[in-house]
């Protein structure tokens, strides 16, 4: 489904108003907190899925969502993500067709209004605007502390749980939901995690570096074309903090790797990004970080899902029962001349270290 089909002129107007109203949304969020303070459940044991894109983050999100034990942002929360309870009371009255359709990535994954999606970054952008430079994102460091953000985000997680609980609950005996997010940019915060991230478990999937790099370049080219054809697509992706591809591309500048980076149209750019990212990940993993091998997840679904359930303290059957949904990703044809052998060896060495330390 194209953006033209999904977002008419009235939708676009509403979204643009919301995208420019961060301060107003924050004020509404404070009102929302006062109104619903006594109804907000705790946000215990949250799970944060984060990695470079095209590594399996979306399938992990869908697998966990399907267990019925997690609460996450969905398309229904757009565009007033900072105040989901108030927006839900208003928007559900005119909810339209919820038919699942292929998402903009053109990768076969189906989404609908009730599908979980990665909108959490809008909260981070509101509180940390200085990290989003013109052509890059600056990783969080030890002196990046913001108690106001910590309090806001903790309450925000509880609001998301409340929205999903009210929508899905079928009785008082339902188990409490856990907050779940997919946010690729949380890897930029591994070295100095704000308090909410320190309270949860981070799932970090990884994939064969050359194949993941090829997949990222393909998406970059696809979204560059989409952005050229429709500026609303670019504005939408930038507003929700999706700076992975296209004209809104802002890579995370891990250890200043961008200083000598090639053009993003070259495969070497994405492979160097992969190396810089996962080296950073290896430097900052701890007991709350779970490395997930996408190869094992798709080659050995039952056993991999059982291990994943174990590390997340879930009953093993709630994930293992979904094993048939997992399949190896498509293989991208890569010209060997595009990847210098030294760069390939460097990436393979990082991949081997990840694989040795993987929990799943």
Task: For the regions a language model picked out, list residue spans one by one.
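PAPS-dependent sulfotransferases, especially Golgi type II membrane carbohydrate sulfotransferases
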Residues: 1-41, 217-360
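The Walker A (P-loop) glycine that initiates the GxxxxGKT/S ATP-binding motif of P-loop NTPases
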Residues: 50-51, 182
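ATP-binding Walker
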Residues: 54-55
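PAPS-dependent sulfation machinery
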Residues: 76-180
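Short catalytic-loop micro-motif centered on adjacent basic/acidic residues
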Residues: 178-182, 291-293
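Conserved phosphate-donor/acceptor-positioning beta-strand/loop module used by diverse small-molecule
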Residues: 182-184, 193-218
